[in-house]
Amino acid sequence: KDKKLLILSNGTVVLDQDKFNTLLKLDVVKFSLDSAISKTFYRIDRALKNINLEKMIEKMAEFKTQFKGDLVMEILVVKDLNDNEEEFIALNQALAKIAPLRVDLSTIDRPPAYAVKKISEERLLELSKLITSTPVLLPKRHYEGEKLNFNEEELLKMLHLRSQSEIDIENKLDKTSQLLLDKLIKE
């Protein structure tokens, strides 16, 4: 069993006991939770109007207690919707209950379905500091300084924590690490 099975879900699947039980069999589960405040949650995730947010958070926490794999949370930050201190204090409290391995925090980076705007990387970093209950991973699109030189173990750990785009690999890793990664992929 050298490959891991991952699913990305909006999190509502925990409300269905059959789906809840099925997810327990996976290696990595990634739930999105863009707000822990009902009014904002329904504005961002418009299709989920009939979902009880508090119950969903409780079921995510219950899922974590039974899950043997890695539970990761994903938060998409949208300008003027969930990009404020109140939102992140509420998210931090919800994340403390859920207790995931980590949180992947990002903003809009593709053309959105609705008229929404991204926030700056600087603001994303500021908001990430309000999440103290679990480790936070931030995407970094613009790299400065020296490129990283990773050995095989470090490369595998990095990829285990977060998949990397080709752009990320080109910008983050030195040539030696890129060649080693190519070799690992071919094996």
Predicted regions and their residues:
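Canonical radical SAM enzyme core domain
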Residues: K1-V28, L33-I37, I51, K55, ...
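Structural preference for beta-strand elements that scaffold enzyme active sites
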Residues: K4-L6, V28-K30, D70-E74, R102, ...
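Short, conserved loop/helix-junction motifs that constitute active-site signature segments
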Residues: N21-K25, K64-F67, A96-A99
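Short glycine-enriched, charge-decorated loop/helix-capping segments at active-site entrances
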Residues: R43-N50, K117-K118
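Glycine-rich S-adenosyl-L-methionine
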Residues: A47-K64
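Conserved strand-turn element in the central/C-terminal portion of the radical SAM core barrel
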Residues: M60-N84, L105-A113, E144-G145
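Auxiliary Fe-S-binding modules of radical SAM enzymes
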Residues: E86-E187
